[in-house]
Amino acid sequence: MTKVLTDARSIRIKGRSFLALVLSPELPLDWWLGRLDDLASRSAGFFLGRPVVLDVADLEIDRKQLKSLLDELGQRNVRVMGIEGGRPSLFEPGMPPAMKGGRPAPDFEVPEVDPADPPKAGKGKAAAPITPEEVQPVRATASIIVREPVRSGQSVIFPEGDVTVVGSVASGAEIVAGGSVHIYGTLRGRALAGSVGNASARIFCRRLEAELLAIDGVYKTAEDMAPNLRGQSVQLWLEGDSIMAERLN
């Protein structure tokens, strides 16, 4: 007998977007995994619980190599939620799904650091005068204010604009902003500004003790920071591929 559903109820389906990191492996894979290990060792827990999309569009690998790469990432607690740019022949049951239509954003790359070189710090170069032809219209920037400390393990993610924290950011916590990051307290965790492609974003904090800083995909870890900046009130900004810093009065 066919059962007739008399109380028809619609199923609510919503669209929603989330922020995920995109990893773009390079050959040879052993070398690239070594660089990934280096980043993870300098910022413990960076990938833990964070959704990741694997971009293999420019990678000449076969299915066996892709499966091995996914296994290696899994051993490093890197949770791959999808694969972008892969040929249909690369996929097999049990792999993360193919993804399309991602919005372009800057790559997050591990900076090359020469241990023999002292950390670069201090004031950046004087800004060149802005001519009228270079002036661009300024759009209003969205922002949120967090009125309490951000505890270890917590994340504040706001890709639409600036994030202001009235308090401190503990070690193991992170702030991710599409615009600038303002910390009215001690920054001990991670702060990522300009996360969706904003090279003019800045990071401000009352006391710098950060594990990791990033602006528009350019990273600086605790080991890369100048000792004279630690414990100071600091602002950081991007010049080319370098993060510049200066103390605030």
Swiss-Prot record:
It comes from the Bacteria. Gene3D superfamilies: 2.160.20.70, 3.30.70.260. GO terms for biological process: cell morphogenesis; division septum assembly; regulation of cell septum assembly. InterPro entries: CAP/MinC_C, MinC, MinC_C_sf, Septum_form_inhib_MinC_C. The keyword Cell division applies. Residues 89-130 are annotated as: Disordered. Keywords: Cell cycle, Cell division, Plasmid, Septation. The keyword Signal does not apply. Belongs to the MinC family. Interacts with MinD and FtsZ. Cell division inhibitor that blocks the formation of polar Z ring septums. Rapidly oscillates between the poles of the cell to destabilize FtsZ filaments that have formed before they mature into polar Z rings. Prevents FtsZ polymerization. This is Probable septum site-determining protein MinC. It comes from Rhizobium meliloti (strain 1021) (Ensifer meliloti). The gene is minC.
